[in-house]
A protein has these predicted regions:
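Aromatic- and charge-enriched surface segment that lines or borders ligand/interaction sites
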Residues: 26-69, 86, 92, 183, ...
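Surface-exposed binding/hinge segments that line
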Residues: 29, 33, 40, 74-119, ...
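A bilobed periplasmic-binding-protein/Venus flytrap-type ligand-binding module shared by bacterial periplasmic
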Residues: 42, 153-157, 214-239, 243, ...
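Ligand-binding "clamshell"
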Residues: 77, 200-212
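Gly/Pro-rich hinge or "lid" segments in bacterial periplasmic/extracellular proteins
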Residues: 107-164, 168
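Ligand-site clamp/hinge motif
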Residues: 156-202
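Structural transition elements
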Residues: 257-287
Length: 287
């Protein structure tokens, strides 16, 4: 996902401070009932082959997302009643109900625009090599040694290129956390998203910045037809829950975790700015 944010850009984007701001959209108008969002695209946005980015590219991207049926395929359709492009510069999204986090959805890579000609030409091979896609983000892919390295270079025609300081990014593809950490500590890497849990307190103690994603960890029971009949007893599941020493798990991790009592973790707020965890009913008293 981090790589995609460099190669492509949605109606919204994450700025230098990881705050959501307008990306390919120059402006947005929200109706009084907060159900209709009308985006006007920037005049200076192009694909890496020089063609202008159009509203239809976004509509095609939305449609293609739903048609693929993969991860996040309903991330937009869950909240959107419809979407359309009345002209090349306008994207209109109508919601089923007000959705304060729509900007977050539209900044997520799954809702980025897509060029129909490239998707149809390459099919399942689309975007598997640098020349099998075009890019509307700040960088374009220069090379991709599969399972080894991706090299990206800054696009001179990106609308905000003058404010980007890094001309080339090398992404090393590593699966071993210990190898990634060793390369980071030696200075070969300036950033890594892999770090063994047991090393995280030490890294923070050295003054380095470590950020944890919004994750929940839980035990899930199969209550379907093929599931264990014993586990379908609510009291059995509660008993198993009581055997989990949550405080001990947090102490072992040594991070700023908190006991999870909801499926949605802390950090998600409603339209009034109230955190969901603070106003929803917890599953169970875990004390």
């Amino acid at each position: 996902l981090s790589a995609m944010r460099h190669l492509y850009e949605g109606l919204y984007k994450l700025d230098a401070n990881s705050e959501i701001s307008l990306g390919q959209a120059a402006s947005v108008d929200v109706s009084d009932d907060k159900l209709t969002w009308t985006f006007t695209l920037r005049d200076d946005i192009t694909w890496s082959d020089g063609q202008p980015v159009t509203a239809q590219d976004f509509i095609y991207g939305f449609d293609n997302l739903a048609a693929q049926g993969g991860d996040y395929c309903t991330i937009l359709s869950d909240v959107a009643e419809s979407y359309e492009a009345p002209d090349d510069k306008t994207v209109v999204i109508k919601l089923k109900q007000p959705c304060a986090y729509l900007p977050s959805i539209l900044a997520f890579p799954s809702t980025y625009p897509a060029r129909q000609d490239y998707v149809e030409q390459y099919g399942d091979a689309y975007a598997t090599d640098p020349d099998k896609s075009v890019y509307n983000g700040p960088y374009e892919m220069e090379s991709w040694a599969h399972e080894s390295e991706v090299v990206m270079k800054l696009r001179d025609d990106y609308y905000d290129a003058d404010n980007i300081q890094v001309g080339t990014i090398n992404w090393e593809l590593i699966t071993e956390e210990s190898s990634a950490l060793a390369s980071f500590e030696s200075g070969d890497y300036v950033y890594s998203d892999m770090c063994p849990d047991e090393e995280k307190p030490r890294m923070e103690g050295n003054g380095l910045v470590y950020t944890e994603g919004d994750n929940n960890y839980c035990v899930m029971f199969n209550l379907g037809e093929n599931g264990n009949d014993v586990l379908k007893d609510e009291n059995v599941r509660k008993a198993l829950s009581l055997t989990i020493d949550r405080d001990r798990i947090m102490a072992i991790r040594g991070l700023n975790d908190e006991i999870g009592v909801t499926l949605v973790c802390r950090g998600y707020v409603n339209a009034d700015g109230t955190d969901f965890v603070d106003y929803c009913d917890p599953w169970e008293d875990t004390s």
